[in-house]
Amino acid sequence: GVGHLTLIDPDHLVSANLGRHVLGADDLGLPKAEALQEQIRKDLPTTEVTAFATFSEVVMYKNPEVFDKADLVVVTTADWQSEVALWRAKSDGTSWGLLQAWSEPHTQVGHALLAPSGAFDARSLFTDNGEFKHKFTEWPEGGVVALPACGESFIPGGSLGMVNIASMVSQTALRVLSGNIDSPSWVSSINRPDDVVMLGGKYLG
């Protein structure tokens, strides 16, 4: 199994995260990385877990040994600046592999881009603001839903679709760590494409 995990996330858990995050209501307001560290320590006491409640690029600069010791870096935060920093480092050549994963709105589709050890760069697959150029679904307003009277917004997604995507990402990561994938790969999870239209979107395939 995985003997060591380093969790990096600057965000705190908010109510909009519930249902699509492994953390629950008891963790609301807590730093995600530190709360998840505690949960993993309780559930898997044999796994060593380190947490940084900051951005990955900060850890790369202040604690470079974290990345130097890593076998695989998995980024699922959908923070484009952090993703750019990781791909910039990857393009120069690294010993660690990079797995970038995310869900499209409503979690009917998820993607994972894998770059093994070496020099690779997937930034050309995205627009300047981080939108994937080969998305499978299209939504009004880019899938962003505004919350009334508070100036906030969110991208909707259900727990069932997220479970499928999380499983796909986990399986891909384990296959990399076990040596079963050693070339650049793009893996996608498609749940119920017929539901995309029902939810107000368009399935592009």
Protein language model regions, located:
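N-terminal Rossmann-like FAD-binding beta1-loop-alpha1 element of flavoenzymes
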Residues: G1
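Charge-rich, low-complexity amphipathic helices
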Residues: G19-R20, D27-L30, A35, F55-V58, ...
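Alpha-helix initiation/capping motif
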Residues: V14, G24-A25, P31, F55, ...
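Glycine-rich phosphate-binding loop and adjoining beta1-alpha1-beta2 segment
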Residues: H4, I8-E48
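A structured beta-alpha segment of the ubiquitous adenosine-cofactor-binding alpha/beta core
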Residues: Q37-D71, A78-D79
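Surface-exposed, flexible loop/turn segments at secondary-structure boundaries
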Residues: L13, E57, H106
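Glycine-rich phosphate/adenylate-binding loop
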Residues: D68-L72, T77-G205
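Generic beta-strand/beta-sheet core signal
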Residues: I8-P10, F52, V75-T76, A101
